[in-house]
A protein has these predicted regions:
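Bacterial N-terminal signal peptides
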Residues: 17-27
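Mid-length scaffold segments of soluble, non-membrane domains
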Residues: 90-167
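Active-site glycine-centered loops adjacent to acidic/histidine catalytic or metal-binding residues
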Residues: 190, 249, 281-282, 305, ...
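Bacterial signal peptide processing site
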Residues: 30-32
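A short C-terminal boundary segment appended to hydrolase-like catalytic domains
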Residues: 218-228, 454-518
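Immediate post-signal-peptide N-terminus of mature secreted/exported proteins
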Residues: 34-74
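Extended active-site neighborhood of metal-dependent phosphoesterases/phosphodiesterases
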Residues: 225-226, 272, 285-371, 384-408, ...
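N-terminal active-site segment of His-dependent metallophosphoesterases
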Residues: 215-291, 382
Length: 518
């Protein structure tokens, strides 16, 4: 069967192809809408809560589409910034008006936070604040509350009214029941809010969700004392900074691993708390999840510290499925924390074309965030794997790291500590002193600092500044300093606390050379 079209003939296949292309083109230009299925909770008592959320999503979805389409129709929305912002505001206002006048004009407290959910949420939060995660939870709440917003304390907003109350911190959101992407948790004082993410209005609230007086500490579980030693040089504590620790080649199950783990706990409790730890590979030498991971780091795990792993040459691929390593079944992955994008690579396969292609896209929307990669094998090193670094890893990965404007790379593999001078704009650290037998250090021309000693690292990112420390099991400082993401950041004046830190840093490590800035 053929169809006449102008001066020629098109067969059915061509018609179908053109129709399909037209449909795909329309779909590609459609505004984004999140999935409409509410995530499942493992707690059966929360089924009524899930049902209430699903009803809300189903009720609002048609108006959500209308709001998104209205935003698409804002003139010049993709051009000047003001027009793009107008499109966002249009989407927000159309849906907010529909919620207030058509969809939920008589909504009241408890419509979504049904009684069984209210009971479960209050119970879980009380238990969490009374447990070993107390310090991280109170730190996170204090940080979010200290935003200068008038709504960060006091009574919750009325339902269907706009609210810019701070979001619940991720460490607390993990305790709460899962909710669809159309909604988000926020808080005002002790009240927990459900806020529509598109409309930015409160759709329900739960009074007295947060414990009234969180316990000051957890009696009976202080860290085992490490003599009378305290951390050598606590980092400054600016508002909004993110802090994390790093360990490499740690999974020995031997005494040095336990000593490094104990030093990390001492630092965590006595100096500065870090919510997560990057593991730089060789996490489990003998595939002993209990002896080489759970036992040494249990005090940190119990306090809510997350570990995020990269695979080393002694690790089995099955580790990607081990939930405490937070790899999400992937041997390369990314995540954002504060002003940084973290990218874990599998350097066991440095030339893997799929990984290389993914790396070229993962920073596409990173903007002004720090770009931080972590993986096992270093590109530059001065231990017994120096030739492998030079001849295998560097040729495979350096061009991609430079091309994607990576700021810092953390690696292990060499059982020592090194800070490498910037190479083509990229700063490299080797931190493989987490517990395995040490390697000899042979200085190279690219080394700024190097020493063969067990250690862990702590890093703090504050805007465009990054402070770092390398610390031994005896709480001695191996290295410390400051790096800057941009030349402009380097030219800005440093605050008094940072200047004090750097002065102490210089006096504490007389053998070390000063850290140069990127």
């Amino acid at each position: 069967m053929r169809f006449a079209h102008g001066g020629g003939m098109l067969d059915r296949k061509m018609i179908l192809l053109l129709t399909l292309l037209a449909f795909l083109g329309t779909a590609a230009c459609s505004p984004y809408l999140p999935p409409t299925t509410v995530p499942q909770s493992p707690d059966p008592s929360l089924e009524p809560f899930k049902a209430a959320l699903q009803a809300y999503v189903d009720q609002t979805q048609p108006y959500r589409k209308q709001a998104a389409q209205a935003a698409e129709n804002v003139p010049g929305k993709a051009a000047p910034k003001s027009s793009a912002e107008a499109a966002v505001r249009t989407r927000q206002n159309v849906l907010a008006d529909a919620l207030k006048t058509k969809l939920r004009p008589t909504a009241k407290q408890g419509d979504l936070f049904v009684p069984t959910a209210a009971t479960a949420i209050r119970r879980d939060l009380v238990q969490a604040f009374a447990g070993l995660q107390h310090d991280l939870l109170t730190d996170a709440l204090a940080e979010q509350n200290d935003t200068g917003r008038a709504t960060s304390a006091g009574t919750p907003p009325a339902i269907n009214e706009h609210t810019d109350a701070p979001r619940v911190p991720p460490v607390i959101a993990e305790i709460l029941p899962p909710i669809p992407k159309q909604l988000e948790y926020a808080f005002v004082g002790r009240s927990l809010l459900l806020r529509d993410a598109d409309a930015e209005v409160a759709v329900d609230y739960l009074p007295d969700a947060m414990p009234e007086t969180p316990p000051a500490g957890v009696p009976g579980v202080p860290p085992p004392p490490l003599g009378a030693v305290r951390p050598p040089l606590p980092l400054p504590s600016p508002r909004g900074a993110i802090v994390f620790a790093l360990i490499g080649d740690s999974g020995s199950g031997d005494l040095p691993q336990g000593q490094v783990a104990q030093a990390m706990l001492t630092y965590f409790t006595a100096a500065r708390r870090f919510p997560f730890v990057l593991m730089l590979g060789d996490n489990l030498y003998d595939d002993d999840y209990t002896g080489e991971f759970v036992t040494p780091y249990k005090p940190l795990l119990d306090r809510g510290v997350k570990f995020r792993a990269a695979l080393g040459n002694h690790d089995r691929d099955l580790q990607i499925h081990y939930k405490p390593f937070n790899m999400n079944d992937r041997d390369y992955y990314s995540f954002d924390e504060g002003n940084a994008r973290f990218v874990a690579l599998n350097s066991n396969h440095p030339r893997d074309p799929a990984q290389q292609k993914w790396l070229d896209g993962v920073f596409a929307d990173a903007g002004s965030k720090w770009r931080i990669c972590f993986f096992h094998h270093p590109l530059y090193s001065s231990g017994q794997h120096a030739a492998e670094s030079r001849d295998v890893i560097r040729p495979a990965l350096e061009a991609a790291l430079v091309r994607n404007q990576v700021n810092i790379v953390f690696s292990g593999h060499e059982h020592l500590y090194e800070r490498i001078a910037p190479q083509q704009g990229v700063r490299y650290f080797v931190s493989g002193g987490g517990g395995r037998k040490l390697y000899d250090f042979h200085p190279s021309q690219f080394d700024e600092v190097g020493i063969s000693q067990h250690h862990f690292m702590v890093v703090q990112i504050d805007g465009d500044r990054l402070l770092f420390e390398a610390i031994t099991p005896e709480q001695k400082l191996l290295d410390c300093g400051i790096l800057f993401r941009t030349p402009d950041a380097q030219r800005k004046s440093l605050d008094a606390d940072t200047l004090k830190f750097l002065a102490a840093c210089e006096s504490t490590r007389p053998r070390m050379t000063a850290a140069s800035s990127r």
